[in-house]
């Protein structure tokens, strides 16, 4: 049985944090995870672990407002995604009588593929498709009368691999 682990979110200059820290050096080429009591002295950026459900507090109108790292496990493999301030995310809403997410955080998706199934009151099923290739970073359930989710997707064109 696979146990889904909640991802860890680390954010630059976090006001409320849980003590765990990550250091980013050389513009993201070096990532160091520090022990809870370990101090860092250097010129890198220090990111602090915050509650993962607060992810959307660091996104304003589709733009990431602070540098962040998301650490999650997909299929038993630990993945780390570094997202720089100013990165554009795609927010895709899914609303219906019943909403069934098909993808989870950390999933790589292709344009035109289904990310959620929507069921109407009559029982009709329709689907929400993604318009871009990318990675699902976060799913937010929005409290409302009808079930409502927002998928935060990092589009492929925002993923940059810097040459050394």
Swiss-Prot record:
Q: Which Gene3D superfamilies match?
A: 2.40.128.400, 2.40.50.100
Task: Output the superkingdom of the source species.
Answer: Archaea
Protein's name according to its UniProt entry: Uncharacterized protein MJ0859
Organism in which the protein naturally occurs: Methanocaldococcus jannaschii (strain ATCC 43067 / DSM 2661 / JAL-1 / JCM 10045 / NBRC 100440) (Methanococcus jannaschii)
């Amino acid at each position: 049985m696979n146990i889904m682990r909640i991802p860890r979110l680390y954010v630059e200059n976090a006001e409320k944090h849980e003590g765990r820290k990550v250091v980013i050096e050389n513009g993201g080429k070096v990532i160091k995870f520090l022990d809870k009591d370990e101090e860092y002295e250097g010129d890198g950026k220090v990111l602090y672990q915050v509650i993962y459900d607060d992810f959307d507090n660091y996104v304003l109108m589709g733009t990431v407002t602070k540098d962040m790292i998301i650490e999650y496990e997909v299929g038993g493999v630990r993945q780390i995604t570094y997202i720089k301030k100013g990165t554009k995310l795609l927010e895709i809403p899914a609303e219906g009588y019943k909403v069934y997410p098909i993808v989870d955080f950390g999933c790589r998706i292709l344009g035109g593929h289904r990310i959620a199934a929507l069921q109407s009151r009559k029982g009709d099923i329709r689907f929400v498709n993604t318009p871009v290739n990318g990675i699902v970073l976060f799913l937010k359930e929005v409290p409302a009368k009808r079930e409502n989710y927002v998928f935060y997707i990092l589009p492929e064109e925002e993923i940059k691999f810097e040459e050394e």
